[in-house]
Curated annotation (Swiss-Prot):
Listed name of the protein: Putative lipoprotein Tanf_09445
Cellular compartment(s): Cell membrane
Organism: Tannerella forsythia (strain ATCC 43037 / JCM 10827 / CCUG 21028 A / KCTC 5666 / FDC 338) (Bacteroides forsythus)
Keyword Lipoprotein: yes
Residues with a covalently attached lipid (S-diacylglycerol cysteine): C21
Domain of life assignment: Bacteria
Keywords: Cell membrane, Lipoprotein, Membrane, Palmitate, Signal
Signal peptide stretch: 1-20
């Protein structure tokens, strides 16, 4: 009888310990886009998963003002983002910052966007027949 009680207590402890264990997330997952901020992590090769960051770091971000529209900036310019099909990222001001880091490359890419996806803390803008995408990561305010 004593052995059964110990077995039941052990099973109960394992059961309660197992249900309380959830992997800790090292990021937050936004439930809506309005008010969220996103920073460019880089260009991703969809086949290999290799990320190539764009310079200067931290200069290609935006914040959503509605569920489908965001405002942000590049090195020197302001930009708008519209989650349409296809998505649209447009440069509002046109100050010549194409010599700054990878701004010229960024400007070429945003003219060719085909689609986008939003999954958890990642926003992906695909181009070149979905072979590459701009990877944006959710940034805590």
């Amino acid at each position: 009888m004593k052995q059964k009680i110990i077995l039941w207590i052990g099973a109960l402890l394992l059961l309660t310990a197992g249900t309380g264990c959830e992997k800790n997330k090292d990021y937050e997952v936004p439930t809506q886009l309005t008010g969220t901020r996103w920073e460019l992590a880089g260009i991703v090769d969809a086949k290999t998963g290799k990320i190539t960051p764009l310079a200067p770091k931290g200069c290609y971000g935006f914040k959503f003002i509605s569920e489908t529209e965001a405002k942000g900036g590049t090195v020197l310019n302001q930009m708008t983002v519209h989650l349409t099909t296809p998505p649209f990222i447009g440069i509002v001001t046109m100050i010549g910052d194409e010599e700054n880091g990878d701004a010229a490359l960024f400007y070429r890419i945003i003219k060719t966007l085909e689609s986008y996806t939003w999954e958890k803390n990642e926003l992906k803008f695909f181009y070149d027949n979905k072979q590459y995408y701009l990877l944006y990561k959710y940034s805590k305010p």
